[in-house]
């Protein structure tokens, strides 16, 4: 098993939380999962998403708001991407990462590609509507113009 410069074990995939960076990553996913639980308490599908910058700092956290807003497009992934673009003043999020509690659907995968996110981390696979490692496997399609690194099932 490889060891990084800090003397901690590290792997790229699956993600191992034994490094200092890994513990920071675990903190991001813990925040996403807590926000997903809050969304469920609000009557939403329990999904939340966060965006981190190139340094790994969390810049936005969003919950599903489809029921509360009466808008089927208000998936947590899309809301997080939109908020990150507003916060940074950028239309593309090169070098930014998405953290989400559930595997993104086709609509959200399209937004991820257009936003040019660097990596996508998701906690749970979605055999019904997931489009990253399940279902249509959006980023494997030859017409997909941007393919982020994917780390699934890490919750």
Where are the regions that the model predicts?
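Short beta-strand scaffold segments in enzyme catalytic cores
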Residues: 47-53
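Small-residue (primarily alanine) positions within well-ordered alpha-helices
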Residues: 32, 36-39, 49, 60, ...
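Short beta->alpha transition motifs characteristic of CBS
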Residues: 59-67
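Zinc-dependent deaminase
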Residues: 9-42, 104-155
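N-terminal amphipathic/hydrophobic targeting modules at extreme N-termini
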Residues: 1-2, 6-7
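A short, polar/charged loop-to-alpha-helix boundary motif
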Residues: 68-79
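Helix-adjacent hinge/juxtasegments
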Residues: 81-111
């Amino acid at each position: 098993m490889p060891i990084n410069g800090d003397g901690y074990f590290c792997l790229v995939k699956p993600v191992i939380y034994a490094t200092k960076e890994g513990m920071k990553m675990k903190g991001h996913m813990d925040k996403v999962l807590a926000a997903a639980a809050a969304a469920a308490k609000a009557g939403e599908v329990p999904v939340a998403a966060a965006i981190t910058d190139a340094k790994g700092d969390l810049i936005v956290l969003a919950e599903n708001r489809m029921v509360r807003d009466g808008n089927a497009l208000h998936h947590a992934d899309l809301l997080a991407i939109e908020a990150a673009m507003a916060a940074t003043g950028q239309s593309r999020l090169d070098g930014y990462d998405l953290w989400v509690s559930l595997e993104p659907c086709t609509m959200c995968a399209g937004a991820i590609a257009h936003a040019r996110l660097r990596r996508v981390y998701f906690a749970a696979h979605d055999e019904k509507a997931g489009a990253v490692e399940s279902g249509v496997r959006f980023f494997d399609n030859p017409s997909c113009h941007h393919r982020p690194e994917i780390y699934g099932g890490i919750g």
